[in-house]
Amino acid sequence: MIRRALLVAVAAASMHATSAMAATCDSLSVLALQNARVTSAQLVAAGAFTPPAPPVVPGREGAAGRAGAAGREGAAGRGGARGGGRGNQPSPYAMLPAFCRVAVTLTPSSDSDIKIEVWLPDSPTWNGKFQAVGNGGWAGTISYPAMANALAAGYATTSTDTGHVGNTASFALGHPEKVTDIGYRAVHEMTVQAKAIINGYYNSAPKYSYFNGCSLGGRQGITEAQRYPADYDGIVAGAVAWGGMDRYVGVIMNESAMLKTSGAYIPPEKYPAVHDAVLQACDGLDGVKDGILENPLACRFDPKALQCKAGEDTVSCLTPAQVQSAKMIYTPAKDPKSGKVLTGGLMPGTELQWGTLYSPQGYGNAIEAMKYIAMKDPNWDPATFNAATDVEKAQKADPESTLKSDNPNIKAFFDRGGKLLMYQGFADPQVTSDNAIRYHQAVIDKVGKHVEGKSIELFMIPGMYHCQGGPGTDTFDKAAVLDSWVMSGKAPDRIVASHLTDGKVDRTRPICVFPKVAKWNGTGSTDDAQNFTCAADGTTKGTK
C-alpha cells in the first residue's frame, strides 16, 4: 500500500490540525500534528485486541493491588447485602469490531510526555460521534476497558495516561509541568488531537463530542467544562474528586487524629456491628427493608447507641474513643484555622468500607499527595502530620488550583448547549457523596436555577460504592443516557439501573434525579423498578 502524507493546516488554538482528505489507517502514522507525534497507526481485526500489561512502578508497596487499572482502590466488589460483587464479567474486548488504533505522544511543554490512544471504528460502524474516557487514581495508564465500551457502542474514542507511567504521584516531585498535565492539560490536548485524527480519518468532524469518566475521570470532566467549555457537547462526571489537596489533607487530618488518640481506631471487625445498627435505625425510612439506605441524608444515627458498657470492648460495641471516631467519620473535615470544609463526611451506609480511607496503612492517594506535592519529600511519614501547620502547607502546594476543580461557574459550557450529567454512589467510601451534592448546588447557585434540569442533573445512587459495586443498582449505560439528553433536549428524571451478581441481573431500581428518591408503590416485587415512583423527600441538603 502506498503511504501518503496527509496535508494538515494548523488552523486555530481550538483545533491543532485538520485533514484535507479521508485516510487509510496506516497513513495516519505520518499525520502532522502540533506538539504531537503519531507513534503508530494500525488496523486491529475484530475481536483481536489484547491490552498491554499494566505498568509496574517500583517503590509503592501494594499500589497495584489497591488501585488497579482504573485507580478505584478496590471499592467495588466487597461486601454488601447481595455480596456487592460483579464477578465473572465478560471481557470488554472479545466482541469489539475492527478498528484503527492510533498511538500518539503529546509534548505541549518541554517536560511533557503524554501518551494517548485514539480508536477509530470502520466507517460503516461509526456512529458519527466521539467519546473520550477518563482515568482513576493518579492515572498513569490508558483506560482500555472504558475505550472498549465506547468503541463497542459505535464511538470513536480516546484515552490518555495524563503524562506519566504508573498509578502513583511520584511523577510530581520536581516536575511542575507534569502536575499541570494531570491537572488539566493532558485531557484538553488529548481532546484537540483526537478530534484532528478523527477528522483526518473520516474526512468528517464528529457530530457530537462527549466525555465520560468517574473519580479522577469525573474531575477531568468538570475541569473540561470549567476550563475548555468548547471541547465537549456533553459530559458524564461520576464521583467527582474535585477537592484537590483540600480533600487529601482533610482525610489525612481525620486519620491522624484517629490513630494518635489511644483506643480511637475502629478495626474492621467492628464495621458490621456499626453497619447493622445504621440499618436498624434507618433502613425502613423508605418503606422497604432491603439493606440499602435510599436517602442517607434522612438518617439520624448516633454512634453513641453502640457505646460499650464500662470495662467492655467487643466486636459488637464501640469504646467511647471509637464513638468519637465514628462521629468524626460522618462529619465533614474542616480547616482548623478558617473552618472551611475540606472534604465531606462519609454517609451512613458506608460502614463496611471505612477501611478504604481510615486504616493504619493510610489512604494511599492522600499519602502520595502529601509526600510528592505538599511536602516534596518521598520519605515523609504520615505519623508526623500536624494539622496546625500541614493543612496550610498542602493548600499552598497548589496555589493555582491545578488539581482542584471547584469552580462552579460553567456558564460558558451551558451557553453552548452543553449538558452535565453527574452521578454518585451514596455509599461511596472514598470520594464522599456530600461533595457531589455541594458542587451541584454551587453550580445552580452561581449560574442560576434555570440550569437545573436543563443543563445539569445529579443522580445519587443508593447503596453504590465508588463508581460501581455495592448492594445498590450500580449498572446503567451512562453514555446512552447523556446522548439521549443531548440529542432530544429532554433531560432524564429517572434512570432504570440494575444490580448484577456474577453477571446476572437480580434487581432493578429507578435512580431518581436529585433531590427525588425512589418510593415503593406498596405492591409488587421490590426488586423490580416498575414498582417504584420517584418522589420528593424532605432531607436533601449537603454540608454547608
Predicted regions located by residue number:
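Gram-negative bacterial Sec-dependent N-terminal signal peptides
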Residues: 2-21
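Catalytic-loop region of hydrolases
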Residues: 19-128, 288-293, 302-380, 480-490, ...
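Cap/lid segment of the alpha/beta-hydrolase catalytic domain
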Residues: 88-92, 127, 132-206, 249-250, ...
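Gly/Ala-rich beta-loop-alpha elbow adjacent to hydrolase catalytic centers
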Residues: 213-217, 221, 428
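A catalytic-pocket lid/entrance helix-loop region that shapes and gates access to the active site
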Residues: 223-225, 230-334, 460, 480
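Short beta-strand/loop motif that positions the catalytic acidic residue
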Residues: 421-424
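Conserved alpha/beta-hydrolase "acid-adjacent" motif
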Residues: 430-434
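Histidine-bearing beta->alpha loop at or near hydrolase active sites
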Residues: 455-469, 500-504
